[in-house]
């Protein structure tokens, strides 16, 4: 469409020029204005389209879009809370959650050394929590667990404190804050139990109200297969396991506060019950070779005593 300004110029020029000549010049000028204006518009629209496309496909916009999508995924997976879901893992997927062979070996070594030191010093202990679940369900360490748990009675605590230097002789570090923690490459938690009415409970009972034993569940202690070694545990573990880990014999829950090798588990994975498969039931491996550290240290101490005398 001819702009109003062009029309007015056209009429003005006709009025101020002579006859047909003026009309012809003005008409030519008007056509020129029309085509110039139309061409300018088309070119402008064309350049505008290219400009919009370039802006849309700019590196900055692409990165921004990727970040928005990434933030959305993180919010969904790690911030939002989810309902429980049930999943069957393939054998390959199970491997993603397993602890490393090095961690497994250090845990079995730590359990062996602890068992031998406590037994040698007549301190009764029992495996507990995830370690008990591992012994019952996997006959070893749960494949995605990375610490150990045992319990001893309050009456044995002073005696236990007296043998702590023997753990240090084996190269272990000792921490104590409500519970005792024996650490090498991995750690073992020792809970001190006492009797409260008809239950045996530990100092963190308020935090873990389902972790207790009735006397007929705990005693007499019995041995459990744990990889290639044997350890002591409660006489009847089922009641304790049912209280702490409902449906433990059907499903595995990967998440635990100690799973440091799984720091980036999403909230979705934390609220997933994995259906137990033969692969998921396999304990953490390898079982060995394990060193005979306690006997070696004992032999060295005896030799030093003889040499001293």
From Swiss-Prot:
It is found in: Membrane. Its main location: membrane. One of its GO terms (cellular component) is membrane. The chain crosses the membrane at residues 62-82. It is a single-pass membrane protein. Keywords: Membrane, Transferase, Transmembrane, Transmembrane helix. The keyword Transcription regulation does not apply. GO terms for biological process: glycoprotein metabolic process. One of its GO terms (molecular function) is transferase activity. Residues 9-55 form the RPE1 insert domain. Belongs to the LicD transferase family. NCBIfam families: RPE1. This is Uncharacterized protein RT0683. It comes from Rickettsia typhi (strain ATCC VR-144 / Wilmington). The lineage of its organism: Bacteria, Pseudomonadati, Pseudomonadota, Alphaproteobacteria, Rickettsiales.
